[in-house]
Amino acid sequence: FNNSGLRWLWLTLVCLAIDQVTKHCVVASFSLYESVNVLPIFSITYVQNLGAAFSFLADQGGWQRWFFTAIAAIACIVFIVWLGKTPKSQTLLSIAVALMLSGAMGNLIDRALFGYVIDFLDFHWSGNHFPAFNVADSMIFIGAVLMILESFTAEHND
């Protein structure tokens, strides 16, 4: 445990807690599609995403709930195994995978409990809106960016 990336599971749990608490606060405080402008380019808008990224497949008959739930569950297993096999010395990679695990878990919890993902971070410019997203999505994105950076900086033995 201490000699692998699993020592970063605390980061996964902290980010997962932040994701779930923020989603709970939005659901408790907002009606569906209610929006509060925070900055000229940013609003908190409560949205239920039945699909994947950018609401992909959201208009299907309901099968996508179980499809995306299964994909998220498999991703969580892969990330946990990956952390377990990552040496302690690969800190940046471990952090990246821990963040992506937290995002996958956060959205998996939403899909399993509600059948949709709770999104609320809404960026917009000149009347154009970027698709709403959440803390879990942000962790997946940040983890992916860190993984790309790690691939450029790591010493690889080929």
Predicted regions and their residues:
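Alpha-helical transmembrane bundles and membrane-interface segments of multipass inner-membrane proteins
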Residues: 1-158
